[in-house]
């Protein structure tokens, strides 16, 4: 930890009164593991990448939302046209009489669940507020900080209204096919996913859906599902006593030998090597 990279307030905030600002990542490059002197919300707009948060890997793409605390360690690797925005804030500088703990998971000791998703409607509403927030956070007039904090309050309420667990899209017809598809894929970690059956259920064109998915995420549907499963396998290898064959089954691979081949191709090491290396670093 002595050599841990720490992002400092003075490099992101204009003065000691500013509570909120926006850091664009157009695109997000590979970024080494780091912590912060501040907290942040991470909103992914497009592309894909590997986000490792407190040693847990997440394959991220459009609609992914993270609540990051100052002490959290995270990094970005294997990025592909990854476009995101960081809304960074200092909890101790917030002055509005808002129940921030109810709005922001992990805020000053509140229960923390870091990873959520936003559907297209929530993304559109959040983007509008973030654009206004970015404008105010770059402003120099006397009320800029107050306006930015008001907009931050609006943003966290908008996110709370529209966010949902990664595998639990609310039953509504207002979300897009891509939102429904990504949720269906998240629910297919342990079982085969049949795209033709999904398209039949949603009465949509399989070819068009494949094109839309690749345009928004930079991956094919099969690539995304495979990498989500491998991320889950990495987590289980590090944090569970399950045998490799059991993990293979829990990650949708009926053949453990095939699982090992895919895992090695994606990570550069066998499942056993990954587990050994992870245990050494703990």
Curated annotation (Swiss-Prot):
An individual GO BP term: positive regulation of DNA-templated transcription
Major localization class: cytoplasm
MF term (GO), any: sequence-specific DNA binding
Compartment(s): Cytoplasm
Site (Interaction with sigma-70) location in chain: 246
Keyword list, A-Z: Activator, Cytoplasm, DNA-binding, Repeat, Rhamnose metabolism, Transcription, Transcription regulation
PROSITE patterns assigned to the protein according to its UniProt record, in alphabetical order: HTH_ARAC_FAMILY_1, HTH_ARAC_FAMILY_2
GO cellular component terms, A-Z: cytoplasm
DNA-binding region(s) from the entry: 196-217, 244-267
UniProt key word Glycoprotein: no
Domain HTH araC/xylS-type: 179-277
Domain of life: Bacteria
Cross-referenced InterPro entries: AraC-bd, Homeodomain-like_sf, HTH_AraC, HTH_AraC-typ_CS, RhaR_RhaS-like_N, RmlC-like_jellyroll, RmlC_Cupin_sf, Tscrpt_act_RhaR
Gene3D superfamilies: Homeodomain-like, Jelly Rolls
Pfam families given in the database record: AraC_binding, HTH_18
UniProt xrefs under PANTHER family: ARAC-FAMILY TRANSCRIPTIONAL REGULATOR, HTH-TYPE TRANSCRIPTIONAL ACTIVATOR RHAR
Record function comment: Activates expression of the rhaSR operon in response to L-rhamnose.
Quaternary structure note: Binds DNA as a dimer.
Protein name per Swiss-Prot or TrEMBL: HTH-type transcriptional activator RhaR
Organism: Salmonella choleraesuis (strain SC-B67)
Classification lineage: Bacteria, Pseudomonadati, Pseudomonadota, Gammaproteobacteria, Enterobacterales
């Amino acid at each position: 930890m002595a050599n841990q990279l720490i992002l400092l307030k003075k490099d992101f905030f204009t003065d000691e009164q500013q509570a909120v600002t926006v850091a664009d990542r157009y695109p997000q490059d590979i970024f080494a593991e780091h912590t912060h002197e501040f907290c942040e919300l991470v909103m992914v707009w497009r592309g894909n990448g590997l986000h490792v948060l407190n040693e847990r890997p997440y394959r991220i793409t459009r609609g992914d939302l993270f609540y990051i605390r100052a002490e959290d360690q995270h990094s970005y690797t294997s990025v592909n046209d990854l476009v995101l925005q960081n809304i960074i804030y200092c909890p101790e500088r917030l002055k509005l009489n808002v129940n921030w703990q109810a709005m922001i998971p992990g805020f000053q000791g509140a229960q923390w669940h870091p990873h959520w998703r936003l559907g297209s409607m929530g993304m559109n509403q959040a983007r509008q507020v973030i654009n206004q927030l970015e404008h105010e956070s770059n402003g120099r007039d006397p009320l800029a900080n107050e306006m930015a904090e008001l907009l931050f309050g609006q943003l966290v309420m908008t996110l709370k209204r529209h966010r949902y667990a990664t595998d639990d899209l609310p039953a509504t017809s207002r979300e897009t096919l891509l939102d429904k598809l990504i949720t269906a894929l998240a629910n297919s970690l342990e079982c085969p996913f049949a795209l033709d059956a999904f398209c039949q259920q949603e009465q949509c064109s399989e070819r068009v859906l494949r094109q839309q998915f690749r345009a928004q995420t930079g991956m094919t549907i099969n690539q995304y599902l495979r990498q989500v499963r491998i991320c889950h396998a990495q987590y289980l290898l590090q944090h569970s006593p399950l045998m490799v064959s059991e993990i293979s089954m829990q990650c949708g691979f009926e053949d453990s030998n095939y699982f090992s081949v895919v895992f090695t191709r994606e990570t550069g090491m066998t499942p056993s090597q990954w587990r050994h290396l992870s245990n050494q670093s703990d």
